[in-house]
Amino acid sequence: MSGIIATYLIHDDSHNLEKKAEQIALGLTIGSWTHLPHLLQEQLKQHKGNVIHVEELAEHEHTNSYLRKKVKRGIIKIEYPLLNFSPDLPAILTTTFGKLSLDGEVKLIDLTFSDELKKHFPGPKFGIDGIRNLLQVHDRPLLMSIFKGMIGRNIGYLKTQLRDQAIGGVDIVKDDEILFENALTPLTKRIVSGKEVLQSVYETYGHKTLYAVNLTGRTFDLKENAKRAVQAGADILLFNVFSYGLDVLQSLAEDDEIPVPIMAHPAVSGAYSASKLYGVSSPLLLGKLLRYAGADFSLFPSPYGSVALEKEEALAISKYLTEDDAFFKKSFSVPSAGIHPGFVPFIARDFGKDVVINAGGGIHGHPNGAQGGGKAFRAAIDATLQNKPLHEVDDINLHSALQIWGNPSHEVKL
């Protein structure tokens, strides 16, 4: 294979999956085949999409009810020749799912890149090992928290929040994805002030915390804004990838003048991936493509919290981010939304050690504030790594957290 193989979930009311697959393969490549003269067929053969797999799935009554018709469901795979497209994500996505995405009854499940094609993508600049080296933390999951309620607040408020989270033992603090450039907390001022706070905490407590600042602005201003952030001392860039596009992420990741990790936020991705019947699968969108395009971290809904993905999907995202690949470094999985300390054993069991535990309300909502919230999570992480039940841990901050949010993991075995 020198091109790309696309895997689709299709729904067909004509009940002929092979015919539908062939129509897709032709429609996204040369347009027609059987009516072409033999000589022209020979000329175009190298450009034709080839159906390589058709698998019928069991009938699904909920699908029939939603579509208001009886359909046959199937998984199909089509190989697209590298000759047909340039080696970039806009061309690849348009080739494999461009006009087909308008069908409303087809879901792009996966894309399998040839080795030749993979060479054109950067992958993470730092990856899991590089991030761990920045923090000098190699033996446990990382802990991340979020600035809360920053809109309309000034730098002083930001500094207080940041200090409390860092003292609590948080490894990374990120901006809220809806915090854009503004007069009260402009980008460079956030970075400079934040770095001062984090350096002070490090000198006093010996704990290093990184700050992920939100990279925003018009598309053609992003590189300049990113370079300003780097010059101001930014540790990590948070980026709302799907508000801009995967190719924009790639252009940032490839730029040598932006030598910092990039954290991909999933905002807007639900518009592409939420349906089970059409769109793009979450594992492909938030896993494989983000990693290939250069994200060092990928945030996605956890299977446990307030905006939950199905566990199978969340684990598939993580697999794409962390599986061995000779071409790419591994990206950190960041299962998010509604996480509190009682979920830590679940996260460690399901995602392993190389994961970022991301909490907002689970840290800020602690009765002892963000310091107490961070310490509760760190106690939960330490106990989990020792395979010790959380309710047996002698830590007042963790006990308070479990009283507020519960301990759903009390019977979890690692």
Swiss-Prot record:
NCBIfam families membership: PRK09549.1 (NF007095), salvage_mtnW (TIGR03332)
Name by which UniProt lists this protein: 2,3-diketo-5-methylthiopentyl-1-phosphate enolase
Family: Belongs to the RuBisCO large chain family. Type IV subfamily.
Modified residues (N6-carboxylysine): 174
Pathway(s) per entry: Amino-acid biosynthesis; L-methionine biosynthesis via salvage pathway; L-methionine from S-methyl-5-thio-alpha-D-ribose 1-phosphate: step 3/6
Function: Catalyzes the enolization of 2,3-diketo-5-methylthiopentyl-1-phosphate (DK-MTP-1-P) into 2-hydroxy-3-keto-5-methylthiopentenyl-1-phosphate (HK-MTPenyl-1-P).
Swiss-Prot/TrEMBL keywords: Amino-acid biosynthesis, Isomerase, Magnesium, Metal-binding, Methionine biosynthesis
Cofactor note: Binds 1 Mg(2+) ion per subunit.
Annotated source species: Bacillus cereus (strain Q1)
HAMAP family the record matches: Salvage_MtnW (MF_01679)
Gene: mtnW
Binding residues annotated for substrate, in chain numbering: 148, 174-177, 265, 338, 360-361
PANTHER family: RIBULOSE BISPHOSPHATE CARBOXYLASE, RIBULOSE BISPHOSPHATE CARBOXYLASE LARGE CHAIN
Protein EC: 5.3.2.5
One term of GO molecular function: magnesium ion binding
CDD domains hit by this protein: RLP_DK-MTP-1-P-enolase
Keyword Metal-binding carried by entry: yes
Transmembrane region(s): none
The protein's assembly and partners: Homodimer.
Catalytic residue list: 99
